[in-house]
Design a protein with these regions (language model features):
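Vicinal oxygen chelate
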Residues: 9-14, 70-115
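Long, continuous compositionally biased terminal/linker segments
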Residues: 40-81
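Conserved catalytic-core motifs of GNAT/GCN5-like acyltransferases
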Residues: 29-33, 98-100, 123-128
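Short glycine-/small-residue motifs
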Residues: 66, 121-122
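N-terminal beta-strand motif that seeds the catalytic metal site of vicinal oxygen chelate
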Residues: 1-16, 69, 126-128
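Conserved Rossmann-like nucleotide-cofactor binding loop
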Residues: 118
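Core segments of cupin and vicinal oxygen chelate
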Residues: 8-52
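Short beta->alpha transition motifs characteristic of CBS
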Residues: 5, 104, 111, 123-128
C-alpha cells in the first residue's frame, strides 16, 4: 500500500547513525542521501533494500508527539539483533523481544524509542 514514509528529526546526524546501526540486523541500508544543498534546505537519508529507499528521515522540526513504525524482520533472531543494536545505538527500551499473542500466535516483536521518541518496532510473523 505505501511506497515510502518519512519523518523529520531533531538531530539529523545522530538519527542517521541510530538508524544505520538499528537497521543493519534487518538488512536495511542507507540507499540514498540528499544534502541540504541539493534540496535547498533540509538533508534527507533514505533507508531500504536493493537501492529503493522506503523509510526517510530528514533534518527539520520534529512532529509533535510520536509515531510508530514496524519493520519486517526475516526471523526472530533478526528481531533480537535489531533490539540489541538499537539499544546500543542509543535507543530506549519500549518492549523487549517476545511473542505478542494478543495480535496473533506468531507475532514476535521488539520495540525501541528512537532519539526523537518515535516507537520503532521490528516484527516477524513466522513461527519459530
Amino acid at each position: 500500500m505505501l511506497d515510502h514514509v518519512g519523518i523529520p528529526v531533531s538531530d539529523y546526524t545522530r538519527s542517521k547513525g541510530f538508524y544505520l546501526r538499528a537497521f543493519a540486523p534487518l538488512g536495511y541500508d542507507l540507499v540514498l542521501e540528499v544534502s541540504s544543498k541539493e534540496t535547498g534546505g533540509h538533508s534527507h537519508a533514505g533507508f531500504g533494500t536493493k537501492g529503493r529507499p522506503q523509510f526517510w528521515i530528514g533534518s527539520g522540526k520534529p512532529i509533535i508527539g510520536s509515531v510508530h513504525f514496524a519493520f519486517m524482520a526475516k526471523d526472530r533472531t533478526a528481531v533480537d539483533a535489531f533490539y540489541a543494536a538499537a539499544l546500543k545505538a542509543g535507543g530506549k527500551d519500549n518492549g523487549p523481544p517476545g511473542l505478542r499473542p494478543h495480535y496473533h500466535a506468531n507475532y514476535y516483536g521488539a520495540f525501541v524509542l528512537d532519539p526523537d521518541g518515535h516507537n520503532i518496532e521490528a516484527v516477524c510473523h513466522l513461527p519459530a
